[in-house]
Amino acid sequence: MSEEFELDTDDLKRRMDGAMANLKTEFASLRTGRASASMLEPVMVDAYGSMTPINQVGTVNVPEPRMVTINVWDKGLVGKVEKAIRESGLGINPQLNGTIIMLPIPELNEERRRELTKVAGQYAEHARVSIRNVRRDGMDQIKKAKADGMSEDDQKFWETEVQELTDKMIKAVDAALETKQAEIMQV
């Protein structure tokens, strides 16, 4: 009989939380009908010879629910920031006002809303797969310990622990998806 098996559930939880954090980041980048500074996070500007995030070349503000402004610090970069936004695929048309770039956020049409809910669903599915992969790793550790002499009762206990953690995280993903889809479909 081997020594007492102790599954590192904290590690499994940390890895599952990482999948949730990644999902939230992906959800934040989805454009809903509301303005958000986080929608510009994936946009990179060719500044000073390297690709730089927009928030490092200017101040990003949300003065109104449907407006994002970027106060570019270096006047020479205004054109590059504008170009980066146009080419980003966000579907936003920047308007220049000196060193301030205004981004009016247009209303989403029904078709685009449906597309975005599908994209959100794909992001959620990726998160579920990541969580299930962590579950599989935990179950593999348990099976290995069983082969090394763990009792069947201990095996069942740890399998239940891992499954409960997985179920809890999958429910959190589903809840986050439901919230995001409602936010996207809100007119």
Curated annotation (Swiss-Prot):
Which InterPro entries does the entry link to? Ribosome_recyc_fac, Ribosome_recyc_fac_dom, RRF_sf
Task: Enumerate the subcellular locations listed in this protein's record, separating them with semicolons.
Answer: Cytoplasm
Q: Which NCBIfam families match?
A: frr
Record's protein name? Ribosome-recycling factor
- Extract the Gene3D superfamilies matched here: 3.30.1360.40, Ribosome-recycling factor
GO cellular component terms, A-Z: cytosol
Keywords of the record: Cytoplasm, Protein biosynthesis
Q: What does this protein do?
A: Responsible for the release of ribosomes from messenger RNA at the termination of protein biosynthesis. May increase the efficiency of translation by recycling ribosomes from one round of translation to another.
Looking at the keywords, is Transferase present?
no
The domain of life is Bacteria
Q: Which GO terms fall under biological process for this protein?
A: cytoplasmic translational termination
Is GTP-binding tagged as a keyword?
A: no
- Entries under Pfam families matching the protein: RRF
Q: Name one GO molecular function term.
A: ribosomal large subunit binding
Q: Which family is annotated?
A: Belongs to the RRF family.
